[in-house]
Amino acid sequence: YDASGIGSNFDIRQIPLDNVERIEILKGSQSTLYGSDAIAGVIHIVTRKAGNKPFMLSGQASYGSYNSLRTNAAISGRVKEVEYNAGYGLFNTHGISEAIAPAGVTNRFDNDGYRQDNAQASMGFRLAEGIRINPYIRYSKIKGELDQQGFVDETDYSYMAKNTQAGIRNEVQMDKLKLNLLYNYNYIDRSFLDDSTGSRNGYYTFSHAQY
């Protein structure tokens, strides 16, 4: 059962924070530059770019409450007219229960875990004076567990969401005029599974959506 349905809105959870350089908030109408959906404003998320050295390596790891593990690693660099950037990130936690046990219930609700994998790669090429192309690809996979509602535990209710993005950007600088040509492919695959007798209808429940 997918309570949220599926649409063209991007799931912001699938952008790993370790790959974000900065976030800009643009208030007011920005339709001229960003399209008709930007009538009230834009949240502009700028991802990290390649460094100025031929090879750079970065990474980090942390561990916290509820067996939460967060790791990421990235390589980037620039060699003459070519730049590259690639990285992988993982977040995994045993989590807490999505549901709250009502008064009088002594059984401990099971924890609802969560795991997210992210991978991305991009390159930049300078073809000629004022002309650049930037191909990129991003992949994200999220797996998690849910409960039925606020006060009802559910041990076999899970979901998975996968997102693949790929595209290419062409920049042409002509004196004071800058032309950007962008192609982007976005594929979303989500599934929800509840195979316990405690499901909403007492039977096996499955929902699968692609966009």
Q: What is each PLM-predicted segment?
A:
Residues 58-62, 85-89, 124, 136-138, ...:
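Transmembrane beta-strands of outer-membrane beta-barrel proteins
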Residues 5-7, 19-21, 32-44, 49-98, ...:
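Outer-membrane beta-barrel translocator/receptor signature
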Residues 1-27:
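Short acidic/polar hinge/loop motifs at secondary-structure boundaries
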Residues 8, 13, 32, 64, ...:
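Alpha-helix initiation/capping motif
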Residues 93-100, 106-118, 126-179, 185-208:
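Flexible loop and strand-edge segments within Gram-negative outer membrane beta-barrel domains
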Residues 26, 46, 74-78, 87, ...:
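Transmembrane beta-barrel domains of outer membrane proteins
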